[in-house]
Curated annotation (Swiss-Prot):
It comes from Cavia porcellus. Pfam families: ITGAX-like_Ig_3 (PF21520). Heterodimer of an alpha and a beta chain. ITGAM associates with ITGB2. Found in a complex with CD177 and ITGB2/CD18. Interacts with JAM3. Interacts with THBD. Interacts with TMEM268; this interaction inhibits ITGAM degradation via the endosome-lysosome pathway. The integrin I-domain (insert) is a VWFA domain. Integrins with I-domains do not undergo protease cleavage. The lineage of its organism: Eukaryota, Metazoa, Chordata, Craniata, Vertebrata. This is Integrin alpha-M.
C-alpha cells in the first residue's frame, strides 16, 4: 500500500446541464437519426489551478449496429485540452440476456468509445 501526502484540498463540482438529453427511445430497425446532447459544467472552487482528466464512455455499437455515431467532446474556448479516443469491447457477449435483465444499454454489453481528455490548467471558478 502506498501513501500520498495531500498538500491542499481540491474542491471540484460537476453538474449536468438542463439542456442535456435525459432519455432517447430507439430501435435498431428504425434508421432515423436523433441528436443527443449532454452538457456538464465543471467548477473549481479551490484556491489554486489544478490539472484534471475527464473520461467519457459512450456506447457506439451493439451487435454491429451503430447506436451512437461520431460522439464528440467540446470544451469552452478558454480551456486548453487534449483528448484521446479508443474503442473498447464489452466484457459480456450475451447482450440479449443482459438487456432483458436491466433494459439499459451500457458499456458492459456494447462496444464503447472511451474519450479521455486532459486539461493541464483548470483555473479557479472556471
Amino acid at each position: 500500500q502506498l501513501e500520498l501526502p495531500v498538500k491542499y484540498a481540491v474542491y471540484l463540482i460537476v453538474t449536468s446541464g438542463e439542456a442535456s438529453t435525459t432519455y432517447l427511445n430507439f430501435t435498431t430497425s428504425e434508421k432515423t437519426i436523433q441528436t443527443m446532447k449532454h452538457q456538464y459544467k465543471f467548477t473549481n472552487l479551490g484556491k489554486r489551478s489544478l490539472p484534471i482528466s475527464v473520461v467519457f464512455w459512450v456506447p457506439v455499437r451493439l451487435n454491429n449496429e451503430i447506436v451512437w455515431d461520431r460522439p464528440q467532446v467540446t470544451f469552452s474556448p478558454n480551456l486548453s485540452s487534449a483528448c484521446n479516443t479508443e474503442e473498447r469491447s464489452p466484457p459480456h457477449s450475451d447482450f440479449l440476456a443482459e438487456l432483458e435483465k436491466t433494459h439499459v444499454l451500457n458499456c458492459s454489453i456494447a462496444v464503447c468509445q472511451r474519450i479521455a481528455c486532459d486539461i493541464p490548467y483548470f483555473n479557479i471558478q472556471e
